[in-house]
Amino acid sequence: MGGFVKTQKTHAYFKRFQVKFKRRRQGKTDYRARIRLTNQDKNKYNTPKYRFVVRFTNKDITAQIVYATIAGDIVMAAAYSHELPRYGLEVGLTNYAAAYCTGLLLARRVLTLRGLDQEYEGNVEATGEDYYVEPADERRPFRALLDVGLIRTTTGNRVFGALKGALDGGLDIPHSDKRFAGFKKDEKQLDSDIHRKYIYGGHVADYMRSMAEEEPEKFQAHFSEYLKKGIDADGMESLYKKVHAAIRADPTMAKSTKKEPATHKRYNLKKLTYEQRKASLVERLNALNSSAGADDDDEEEDDE
């Protein structure tokens, strides 16, 4: 009768034990997925597989084009949602629409870097429908593979918003439309109107309207930044259209202006020369002598 046999952790067990990779122990990297994203055919030389990497934090979205080398991963180009205020989007930097803008920005940036931006303009008007870039006569489109990391790939996840932005920007990324926002499982097809609504922030606009009617006080607090910037539900679509146009006009990364280093106060005493030390000693001696002479005069007056 077989059963569960507890591992005997003997001297031999510990001697032969091999630890897993550090990023596996930390739960940061799925190596089963990574090896398939990075391993290139052995008959191809100096032709890396490029990955379209998307990661989310609480306040930012990071999109990168990365390729692997023996020395480590090399980031060829990157775009962040905190760059979007430069293009006119100052609030809502982590939603589906912002993810689309970040993906679009990265696509236009990397194509500009490779000199393909004129040849592959992508889908200029976002309609919500699926889009595949058509190869041109001279140069093939820039191909990358979607790297989602440890994100759970549910339908409508923001990572697919970034993917859609990159596709409309002109990148060639193998994909299916099954995970875009608006895909209907029963009908097995994408509802492009719903997807377009998400791309232009329509879901946020609907939420703004419903909250303004039902809970006005909560609305004032929840959308305080939107209200400060003068953004309302009706102007949401026009705002995102302007952002998309601004990204296409200038996708290059802005150079950061470095401030001049501040002059720090010196707290350590500056080293004095021999003449300065001698003069200082003379001053101190004179001060002591004068104070001693003043004390003697006071004592004589008291005796009288």
Swiss-Prot record:
Annotated TM spans: none
Cytoplasm recorded as keyword: yes
Organism domain of life: Eukaryota
InterPro entries recorded: Rbsml_uL18_euk, Ribosomal_uL18_C_euk
Subcellular location: Cytoplasm; Nucleus
This protein's GO CC annotations: cytosolic large ribosomal subunit; nucleus
One GO MF term: 5S rRNA binding
Keyword rRNA-binding: yes
Entries under Pfam families matching the protein: Ribosomal_L18_c, Ribosomal_L5e
Keywords of this entry: Cytoplasm, Nucleus, Ribonucleoprotein, Ribosomal protein, RNA-binding, rRNA-binding
Main location: cytoplasm
Gene Ontology terms describing biological process: ribosomal large subunit assembly; translation
Assembly mode: Component of the large ribosomal subunit (LSU).
Family: Belongs to the universal ribosomal protein uL18 family.
Function: Component of the ribosome, a large ribonucleoprotein complex responsible for the synthesis of proteins in the cell. The small ribosomal subunit (SSU) binds messenger RNAs (mRNAs) and translates the encoded message by selecting cognate aminoacyl-transfer RNA (tRNA) molecules. The large subunit (LSU) contains the ribosomal catalytic site termed the peptidyl transferase center (PTC), which catalyzes the formation of peptide bonds, thereby polymerizing the amino acids delivered by tRNAs into a polypeptide chain.
Protein name: Large ribosomal subunit protein uL18y
